Amino acid sequence: MTAVGIDVGKAFLDVAMDGRPGVVRVANSAAGIRKLVRQLAGLAEARIVVEATGGYEEALLEACCDAGLWVARVNPRQARNFARAAGDVAKTDAIDAGLLCLMARMFADRLQRYRAPLPWQRELRDWLRRRGQVVTALQAHRQQMAMCPGPIRSLAARTLTALRRELAAIDQQMQLLLDAHATPALCSCKGLGPVFQATSLALLPELGALDRRQIARLVGVAPMNRDSGQSSGARRIRGGRASVRVALYMATLSAVRWDETMKAHYKQLRARGKLAKVALVACMRKLLTIVNARRRDELLQEAAQPA
């Protein structure tokens, strides 16, 4: 096995490999990635680890997948915690690449291999990203409107109108993709609206392929122990995919009002003395478990059908 760590920046890729001194820097461009992938393809059983860097790593990941290379994308917090555990408190691109290489050498068997999204999933993810940007801009403009004097207020109102039109257009494009690819499992409970469906399809492809505990940990709604000796700390959620968790939270808020099963579960938890937010997170976990199980059944039915 040859471990490879790649630190990704907007302009450059810093590459550290087992058995090779120093770090190689290549351009984070189509030509630079092609050259790097050709080099990596010649290595013996390469295990490549890349840190998530706000989307700048996606072209590299997809090129590696197209070439049949094993590559994993790790959370920046995981990488930073690993660096601290290794005793490296300094941070440079070269140091980060070396530490990612060390992580690949030590933990390749525990890291999840990256699977490239299908073209429609990539398109849906792009629409979701833009939708989030527009929603954030709308919230900011609404807050600013209260402080705007008369002449500026009319200009701000035009901006709000334009943003609302763009949001409607984005939702329309997303709905076209949902009509083509959403399955009954994703709309099997009240509260599972278009945003949750789109987020699940684009950002949670593992839905239905994992058991209930694994999917809860992946999304970040599993209660984590905090025990030491004779003390037993409160269980808390942490980590996971924030975008999916936000969409699940909003879906659960609606579900505990309108879905009879979820409403009864929430009321039962509150009657047992659970805090409102604790009960809501438990409902998030239950809703995710239900959708995951129904999606699993769909996948089994699809696999059983003759080709």
PLM region spans:
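A residue-level signal for conserved active-site and pocket-lining positions in enzyme catalytic cores
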Residues: 100, 134, 248, 273, ...
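Phosphate-backbone recognition surface of nucleic-acid-processing proteins
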Residues: 194, 199-272, 276, 302
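Short helix-capping/linker segments at secondary-structure and domain boundaries
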Residues: 107-112, 141, 205-209, 255-262, ...
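Short alpha-helical scaffolding segments that buttress acidic/His motifs in well-ordered protein cores
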Residues: 103, 125, 200, 247-252, ...
